[in-house]
Amino acid sequence: MTTIVRDGPLSGAMRRWAAIILTSLMLTVPVAPAASAQIGQPDIIQEHWYHSYLTLTLDVQAWASDYPEIVVLTVAGETELGRNLWVLKISDWAQNLKPDGTEKEVVYIDGGHHGNEHLGTELAFLTAEFYIEGWAAGDQEVIDVLSTTELHILIMLNADGNDIDTRWNINQVDLNRNYDHYWNTCPTTQPGSSAFSESETEANANYMNTMVSDADLYVTMHTGVWIMLYPWGKWPQQPSDWELFHFIRDDVHANISDIPIRNANQGLYPNCGTSRDYGYGVMGFPTFTFETDDEQFLLGSVEAISDRLGEELDVMRYLIQNVWYWRARLVVESIEIGDGLVDAHVVNLGRASTSNASLHYMDSSGELLWQSSMFGINATNETEVSLDARNLTLVEGGTWSINYQKRVIDASMWVNESVDENVIRNKGGGSGLLPAPSMLLVFVAFALAAINSRNRKFK
């Protein structure tokens, strides 16, 4: 495995030795005072001492108490030792919808699968801190994001392992090999007795399925090497949504960071049963493993943590700020009906492709009357399609929608979105097309009914 070391104020080796010295000194500080100082003296403690479960609990509870308008603290489940898996739900909760009345985007982040990978946990913490403190400071970027987006952040999944500084959970299981996606099919150690044998991974997957099933971004944070990994870990082949991942890679490299961004199998090694591949292969999310640093097993940092992870936080801000684009976004520009065909012009504003879009026509009660054949449209592209409409019958009050998956991966969520009635044009004359009755036909029908009624009266 290639280790990538960035240039900075301290080399990797020097930084590790300095951290060892710092950690030795800090271990002389009693645990309880350090915990209370975590909040009261952020410049001294927060910037150099990695979180324990206790100090994290103090911090997230303080945030929820101080900023109830944007922070909701909930529990996804418990560790094997019964510790709470805290999740911060961060958004402008004064409004449940975006300003335009549509549903908010959803982002899911977790850290701390491996208890000895503290900088991954700290990046999850810093991400939450950026949006909470930015809101308090009136940062316009943060205000805009929280008005349109929900952030769900589980900062420390392996709290038991974190506090004894070990990769495994208390049962000696590697939590990031314990998910139900090709579990135990790669060379690995300690994947557990079965998929989801551990309470931590079961709780994390349950949260994905019940609370953030419509997420358009999932980032899981680790350390070990400086790299971002997208699916797959099991296979070297590119994932179905390679266009999306390659766009993000190229955009990050052009504008933010030179961090390597690769398929996990090629960029690291074969790895199965991971939360990343579960998030993509089962949930259909765009997913990244964010390996923030090569450091492991240290409890503190000489360099300020916010400086050390500043570049990585910039990448997270980019991913979150642009989450609207991490799916297909189809807009029907026009529909023309006639001659047994429906001609449609469809634009994809998103950075992901979709391969199975179709037009739907419903009556006023929402009952499906007609469905087109499926068609695909690539990311940031547009298409003109002619669809067989010989069995289409128009009715008064009928409406149109477009139905499609948000990404190419089979697990991706389906959406059904309304088509603006102003873009629909009925040219008439097509076989099987029955427009609403004209006024002349209505008048004739009433006249015939009156004559028939009169004839019955005088019989």
Segment roles from a protein language model:
Residues 1-38, 344, 427-459:
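Secretory targeting signatures
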Residues 37-86:
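Short glycine- and acidic-rich boundary segments immediately preceding or forming the N-terminal edge
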Residues 39-49, 183-432:
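C-terminal accessory segments enriched in acidic
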Residues 71-77, 137-145, 217-218, 261-265:
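Surface-exposed patches in mature extracellular/periplasmic domains of secreted proteins
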